[in-house]
Regions:
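Short, intrinsically disordered or compositionally biased N-terminal tails of bacterial proteins
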Residues: 1-6
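A short alpha-helical element within helix-turn-helix/winged-helix DNA-binding domains
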Residues: 31-41
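Short coil turns linking two alpha-helices in DNA-binding domains
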Residues: 43-46
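Basic amphipathic alpha-helical segments that dock to polyanions
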Residues: 51-55
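Beta-hairpin "wing" of winged helix-turn-helix
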Residues: 57-66, 70-72
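Non-DNA-binding regulatory cores of transcription-related proteins
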Residues: 74-144
Length: 144
């Protein structure tokens, strides 16, 4: 199990989990926010908010009431980066800086100059890698 300390919010994994449920159960169940919440282990309100984000990103269709959700795009065409963006993760900084480095200190005064571009490079590397991974790849690993 991954125990990293980076700042990607749980929204990304909730979004992936949501899309996997929609695809995996599409032929057997009406995949509603309550149904998905039972798999994810969160309140259905959190799933409804995520479904709205995924809908706004044109990844899912959600039928009003208890109509359920369905993918608008095949899983092999949905990249993890698409999901990352839809979940709003690209709007947040991957790495959060401590708030008050001492500007009078030779380290604290230059820490941003020394580290910011490296953090941007790491963020770009992650995003580039996410673009190569598809929801269908994750789907296949569920069956292992």
């Amino acid at each position: 199990m991954y125990n990293g300390r980076m700042q990607i919010s749980r929204d990304f994994t909730i979004a992936v989990h949501t899309l996997l449920c929609i695809e995996y159960f599409k032929n057997d169940y009406k995949v509603t926010s309550d149904f998905i919440a039972g798999s994810v282990g969160v309140n259905p309100v959190i799933i409804r908010r995520m479904l709205l984000r995924l809908k706004n990103a044109n990844l899912v269709e959600v039928k009003a009431g208890t109509g359920g959700a369905s993918l608008l795009i095949p899983p092999e065409k949905i990249s993890l980066y698409d999901i990352y963006k839809a979940a709003g993760c690209d709007e947040k900084q991957l790495f959060n800086f401590h708030e008050n480095p001492n500007s009078k200190c030779p380290v604290g005064g230059h820490i941003h100059n020394a580290l910011d571009f490296r953090l941007e490079l790491l963020t770009q590397t992650l995003e580039d890698k996410l673009k190569t991974m598809k929801l269908s790849d994750v789907m296949k690993d569920l069956e292992k």
